[in-house]
Every structure is written in structure tokens, then in C-alpha cells.
Amino acid sequence: MQYRTLGNTGLKVSEIGFGGEWMDGTLEETIAVTRACEDAGINIIDCWMPDPTRRSNLGDALQELGSRERWIIQGHLGSTWQGEQYVRTRDLDQVKPAFEDLLQRFHTDYMDLGMIHYVDKVEEFEQIMAGPFWGYVQELKQTGTIRHVGLSTHNPAVAKL
């Protein structure tokens, strides 16, 4: 596996990452996939999905394998589970418990990367940076609950900001 330094974080991440979106089967299946990723040298996992089954499977797999410290985990802020479905939101009354749930299900007190989830409009980026959502992100960073801050987007204009 080849590794690269991720931006200005100093983190060495594998060129191939583990997107855990499809880990909604059994815990045994998730453990097998996670172990295969580890054996291949993959060391970064992205957990954008708020579904409790996926989060629990991934967190329990890392705990079972004793490998939390070997992984760089991207946890998303703004990805929530409401009424049995995914909802993207900036409402802190929903964002905070969703992020706390992520930490709990991963059996950890920190995320290596706190990803501001799915920002595809420049106007939305500006609102986030000027509002309470950004304040919450800064608070998490200051307390060490997230080690580095990132942003997920599908828009090159937002990525360049």
C-alpha cells in the first residue's frame, strides 16, 4: 500500500480508503471486511452514514480487532438519523447528539478527522463558517474530540475555499 500525507495534518493515509457505507450486514461480515482492509494496509475509514447498524458494526469491529489506534477515522458532522432515514442538517440540536452517538458507537472519545458533511454551495459554506455550526466544530477541535477538521463536498468551487 502506498501512503500520502493528508493536507497539512501530518497524517499518513493509505491511497485507498475504507468507505463503510455497506457495513449493514452482520458484525462477523464487518469484522472480515475490516480485517481484510487492515491486511491490505488501508488505514483510513470514512463514516458519513448515520445509520445505527453501520456505525455499531464498524465500531464493534474495530473494538473486536483491537485496532482503533491503527485507523484514521473520518466522522461527519451534519449527517443525522431521523425517523429511520438519513438527514443532512446544520441544526445543532440534531448534530450534537448524532456526533455523540458516532463516538459512542465507535467506542472512542475522539475522531481523527471531523468532516463538515456535504457542503456543495458556496453560500452554505459561508453560512456555516459564520454561524454556530462552525463554533461547535471549533469547540470539538479545542477539546481534542476531533483532531483535524475537513469538509466533504462535490463542488470544486467549495473545495477551493
What are these regions (language model features)?
Residues 29-31, 58, 71, 86, ...:
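A generic "cationic amphipathic patch" detector
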Residues 21, 48-50, 76-80, 116-119, ...:
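Active-site beta-loop-alpha junctions enriched in small/polar residues
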Residues 19, 47, 84, 100-103:
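Generic anion/oxyanion-binding catalytic loop in active/binding sites
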Residues 16-29, 77-96, 122-126:
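Active-site mouth loops of central-metabolism enzymes
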Residues 39, 87-161:
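Glycine/proline-rich, positively charged
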